[in-house]
Swiss-Prot record:
Belongs to the DAD/OST2 family. It is found in: Endoplasmic reticulum membrane. Disruption phenotype: RNAi-mediated knock-down is mostly embryonic lethal. Embryogenesis proceeds more slowly and embryos are osmo-sensitive. This is Dolichyl-diphosphooligosaccharide--protein glycosyltransferase subunit dad-1. Component of the oligosaccharyltransferase (OST) complex. GO terms for cellular component: oligosaccharyltransferase complex. It comes from the Eukaryota. Keywords: Apoptosis, Endoplasmic reticulum, Membrane, Transmembrane, Transmembrane helix. It comes from Caenorhabditis elegans. GO terms for biological process: apoptotic process; negative regulation of apoptotic process; protein N-linked glycosylation. The chain crosses the membrane at residues 33-53, 56-78, 93-113.
C-alpha cells in the first residue's frame, strides 16, 4: 500500500510545482498557515480549556473565515477559472479579499469586547 502511495504523492507534488503559478502558491502557503493555526487552537481548546470562551470563539471563527475567504480568492485568481469569473479581475478579487478581511477582523475585535 505504501509503495503505491509514494509515487502518486511524488507525481502530485511535481505537477503542483510545475503547473501552479507563484500567486497560487503564496495563497496556498497562507491557507496552510491558517489551517495549522486553527488546528492548534482546537487542540489547545481540548487540552487546556476554553476560558475565556469569547477569545477562543473569536479566534477560531477568525481562522475558519479567513480560510474560506482565502479559498474564494484562490478560485477567483486561478487562470483555469477565468470563464467563471469574467467580470472580476485579479486586482478586484484581491481588493475584495482585503475588504472582507478588514470587516471580519473588525467583527472579531468587537466580539472580544
Amino acid at each position: 500500500m505504501a509503495a503505491q502511495v509514494v509515487p502518486v504523492l511524488s507525481k502530485l507534488f511535481d505537477d503542483y510545482q510545475k503547473t501552479t503559478s507563484s500567486k497560487l502558491k503564496i495563497i496556498d502557503a497562507y491557507m496552510t498557515y491558517i489551517l495549522f493555526t486553527g488546528i492548534f487552537q482546537f487542540i489547545y481548546c481540548l487540552l487546556v480549556g476554553t476560558f475565556p470562551f469569547n477569545s477562543f470563539l473569536s479566534g477560531f471563527i477568525s481562522t475558519v473565515t479567513s480560510f474560506v475567504l482565502a479559498s474564494c480568492l484562490r478560485m477567483q485568481v486561478n487562470q483555469e477559472n477565468r470563464s467563471e469569473f469574467t467580470a472580476v479581475s485579479t486586482e478586484r478579487a484581491f481588493a475584495d479579499f482585503i475588504f472582507a478581511n478588514l470587516i471580519l477582523h473588525l467583527v472579531v475585535v468587537n466580539f472580544l469586547g
